[in-house]
């Protein structure tokens, strides 16, 4: 059974689809997608469940969420293995994701109290009380690169605030979504509070269009997110939270300090998860001159030595494959396009078996107008520059604004960088791909419109209600003109 609707597992009635393991192309999951009618059934179930769920004391909702966290901990190795099989990421990496699924729940609970509690103050003779109320039914769209903890980062805050959920995982990772839903089932979640619908584009469109949806929480590609944004132009009654990708710049100063540490930071920023993190460095700005040359020489050498292999291989690999053969082809096509524009490959990304692509580095300094696209994979573009001001100017030449970084030991350079860079997440001497659940996650421009994270997700899962309250009725000393009593 593929879908969880109104507390029951049901078979999909739409088109058949499969999940292929990206490292060997074996079928590891198969089912039928949800039809528009089944999506509407899921939304109706969530709508009905919302009436009771929002009335429950917070302590009851919290208890169910905490029970789910314990289930995740008990099944963490199984979760890690399923994610590794579906995404191809090394098992050491998917274990960290399984841990994050449970670990960030504590942050979400704290955020509920900090950001959606009640507050009272006096103003102009009125007692002003600020309360927060749930939006209603939330549609959660999960990404394939972190199919466990990223959807969880939307679902948990939504439930804590009193919302109900219809969850659509990525069509690339249906198994992970199904496993998570079974854990919610085991902790006794009331029927209809979460509903799972699987499928591809048609299922997603039906969910976003459903009349009973009050808000959409989306994590995924900019292209899909922008389609949703246009789709919502005629639906002003729905809240839309988008967290999309980035064309993220990483600037290396002449004052970078330790060479090995600098190169390691670059590799972690560009190639972890096979480049399939939205915060990965896409463009690397390196100064002209001997110090910059040293970085490139060391980086090329270290990149050639990156171990790329299947997720359970020994010794452990640093990188696995792309999520699909199509995704691998996209990276190779992007490389070919940059080469045709005048880019010079320092290391050429090459296709391997199934969806494997080796990491590539290409010098694009001589390309007058770089394509402003997110190449979601292990393809790093190098741009040489003179002067930090020029580097920041080049780094800001993008429609995205998710993450950016500077490697520099000079405090004044850092102050200039943070004052002038356009990005929502900025790092100094740290990898771009690190993120804290306590910090806002997102950026301006084409990278999204809100800042989802374990902590800040509370902001868009409940709306503020302001009430001006008096203990008794009071007749003012002066009545408004034209009124007599």
Swiss-Prot record:
Active site at which residues?
243, 278
Q: Which GO terms describe its molecular function?
A: succinylglutamate-semialdehyde dehydrogenase activity
Tell me any Pfam family this protein matches.
Aldedh
- Answer yes or no on keyword NAD: yes
Q: Which InterPro entries match?
A: Ald_DH/histidinol_DH (IPR016161), Ald_DH_C (IPR016163), Ald_DH_CS_CYS (IPR016160), Ald_DH_CS_GLU (IPR029510), Ald_DH_N (IPR016162), Aldehyde_DH_dom (IPR015590), SuccinylGlu_semiald_DH_AstD (IPR017649)
This protein's pathway reads: Amino-acid degradation; L-arginine degradation via AST pathway; L-glutamate and succinate from L-arginine: step 4/5
Kindly list the positions annotated as binding NAD(+): 220-225
Instruction: Report the top EC class in one word.
Output: oxidoreductase
Q: Which HAMAP family match?
A: Aldedh_AstD
Please give the function described in this protein's UniProt entry. Answer: Catalyzes the NAD-dependent reduction of succinylglutamate semialdehyde into succinylglutamate.
Protein name per UniProt? N-succinylglutamate 5-semialdehyde dehydrogenase
Its source organism is Vibrio campbellii (strain ATCC BAA-1116)
């Amino acid at each position: 059974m593929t879908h969880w609707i109104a507390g029951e597992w049901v078979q999909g009635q739409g088109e058949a689809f499969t999940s292929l393991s990206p490292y060997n192309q074996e079928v590891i999951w198969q089912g039928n997608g949800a039809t528009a009618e089944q999506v509407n059934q899921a939304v109706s179930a969530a709508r009905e469940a919302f009436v009771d769920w929002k009335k429950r004391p917070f302590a009851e909702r919290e208890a169910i969420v905490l029970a789910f966290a314990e289930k995740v901990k008990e099944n963490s190795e199984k979760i890690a293995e399923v994610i590794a099989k579906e995404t191809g990421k090394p098992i050491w990496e998917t274990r960290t994701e399984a841990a994050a699924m449970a670990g960030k729940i504590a942050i979400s609970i704290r955020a509920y109290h900090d950001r959606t509690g009640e507050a009272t103050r006096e103003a102009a003779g009125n007692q002003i009380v600020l309360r927060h109320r749930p939006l209603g039914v939330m549609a959660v769209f999960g990404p394939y690169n972190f199919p466990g903890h990223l959807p969880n980062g939307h679902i948990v805050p939504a439930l804590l605030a009193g919302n109900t959920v219809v969850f659509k995982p990525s069509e690339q990772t249906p198994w992970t979504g199904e496993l998570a839903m079974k854990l919610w089932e085991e902790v006794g979640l009331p029927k209809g509070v979460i509903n799972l619908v699987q499928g591809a584009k048609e299922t997603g469109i039906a969910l976003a269009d459903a009349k009973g949806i009050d808000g959409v929480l989306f994590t995924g590609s900019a292209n899909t997110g922008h389609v949703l944004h246009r789709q919502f132009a005629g639906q002003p009654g729905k809240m839309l939270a988008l967290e999309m990708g980035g064309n993220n710049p990483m600037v290396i100063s002449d004052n970078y300090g330790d060479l090995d540490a600098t190169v390691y930071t670059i590799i972690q920023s560009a190639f972890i998860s096979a480049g399939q993190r939205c915060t990965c460095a896409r463009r690397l700005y390196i100064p002209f001159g001997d110090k910059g040359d040293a970085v490139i020489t060391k980086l090329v050498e270290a990149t050639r030595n990156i171990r790329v292999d299947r997720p359970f291989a020994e010794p452990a690999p640093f990188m696995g494959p792309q999520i699909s053969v199509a995704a691998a082809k996209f990276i190779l096509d992007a490389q070919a396009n940059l080469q045709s524009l005048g880019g010079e490959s320092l290391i050429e990304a090459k296709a391997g078996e199934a969806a494997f692509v080796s990491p590539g580095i290409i010098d694009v300094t001589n390309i007058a107008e770089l394509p402003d696209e997110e190449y979601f994979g292990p393809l790093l573009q190098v741009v040489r520059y003179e002067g930090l001001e020029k580097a920041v100017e080049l780094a800001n030449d993008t429609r995205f604004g998710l993450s950016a970084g500077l490697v520099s030991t000079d405090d004044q350079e850092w102050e200039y960088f943070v004052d002038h860079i356009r990005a929502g997440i900025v790092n100094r001497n740290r990898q771009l791909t690190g993120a804290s659940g306590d910090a806002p996650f997102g950026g301006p421009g084409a990278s999204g419109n809100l800042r989802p994270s374990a902590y800040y997700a509370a902001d868009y899962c409940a709306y503020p209600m302001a009430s001006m309250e008096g203990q008794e009725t009071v007749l003012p000393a002066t009545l408004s003109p034209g009124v007599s009593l």
